[in-house]
Amino acid sequence: MKLQLVAVGTKMPDWVQTGFSEYLRRFPKDMPFELVEIPAGKRGKNADIKRILEKEGEMMLAAAGKNRIVTLDIPGKPWDTPQLARELERWKQDGRDVSLLVGGPEGLSPACKAAAEQSWSLSTLTLPHPLVRVLVAESLYRAWSITTNHPYHRE
């Protein structure tokens, strides 16, 4: 199974690249984790936000292909670390690759939400999207460590 983070935005601060890359390199060869960056639509005074969301959503769904789609969204289910580890095990048993979708400033398109088999809420707080990348990578790595009895996670 391959994990894929599909996120809107392409120019992240160095600390995001460093943090995300650190967890990326830790993932085992049998569970590769990749980042697919979707260019954010141009926003401005007269921007058609609905159209921008649609376009970003189309690109996200195209990147996900036939993968299981999990959206990251405030109204999603709040999984604690052991629950995320159980979800990771279910995903592995399912046999499909998994795409986790992170929207842009206005969130996810209705099409992305409709295509999702699951929706995961990291927090009821509004989080900066660059930080979400690092949080997701660390959370998935920690969940993997639980499923393999790796010493990274401690109770």
Curated annotation (Swiss-Prot):
TM helices/strands, residue ranges: none
Predominant subcellular localization, coarse grouping: cytoplasm
EC number: 2.1.1.177
Gene Ontology, cellular component aspect: cytoplasm
Protein's cellular compartments: Cytoplasm
Keywords from the named record: Cytoplasm, Methyltransferase, rRNA processing, S-adenosyl-L-methionine, Transferase
UniProt entry tagged with the keyword RNA-binding: no
Enzyme class: transferase
Database matches in Pfam families: SPOUT_MTase
Residues that hold S-adenosyl-L-methionine according to the record: 72, 103, 122-127
Reactions mediated catalytically: pseudouridine(1915) in 23S rRNA + S-adenosyl-L-methionine = N(3)-methylpseudouridine(1915) in 23S rRNA + S-adenosyl-L-homocysteine + H(+)
Role, per record: Specifically methylates the pseudouridine at position 1915 (m3Psi1915) in 23S rRNA.
Classification via HAMAP family: 23SrRNA_methyltr_H (MF_00658)
Family: Belongs to the RNA methyltransferase RlmH family.
Self-association and partners: Homodimer.
Protein name per Swiss-Prot or TrEMBL: Ribosomal RNA large subunit methyltransferase H
Organism for this UniProt entry: Klebsiella pneumoniae subsp. pneumoniae (strain ATCC 700721 / MGH 78578)
Lineage: Bacteria, Pseudomonadati, Pseudomonadota, Gammaproteobacteria, Enterobacterales
